[in-house]
Amino acid sequence: MRNRLYASRYIELNDPMEGQYYYNKGELNKSVRRKISSDKGDLRLCSLSRKKDNELMWSHYADGHHGIVIGLTVDRGKFDVRPIQYTGLHYLTGGQIEQDTPREILSHKLEVWSYEEEERVFVADKFYVDIQVREVITGRAMSNQDFGFIRELIDKINPSINLIKADTFM
């Protein structure tokens, strides 16, 4: 309703390896590792997918096709949006960190997650990311009653939002 998404801390995400990284023993002293940890903790992020027709995503994140997918736009001029690199955990070399290091660490995931085709929106000073909702896609297993509720809600909030049933393209 307010055209925004909650931005989570990385520790609130579902991947237990989130925020982990590799480094050579002795290259990063304890104070540098603490600084990285603190800087990662200061960031908030939204995890988004580029795909709306991925069966696994619907099963894992949309209540087994009973839920919805929201098609949205993020202003890339206003927010730092980065594609996830599925090359494993980020590898830090040298004893120095850059201002961008925490975002780089949080932009790497294990290859097993690559089906998500994820992009992340990073914010450091906000709890929300402004978005523009373009479409709402309802799951193939959504009840008629729930679909009707979603239809009424969209009509009241913003009738220009497209309502699409997933079974029309999956």
Language model regions located:
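Partner-binding and oligomerization surfaces adjacent to conserved cores of proteins
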Residues: 1-170
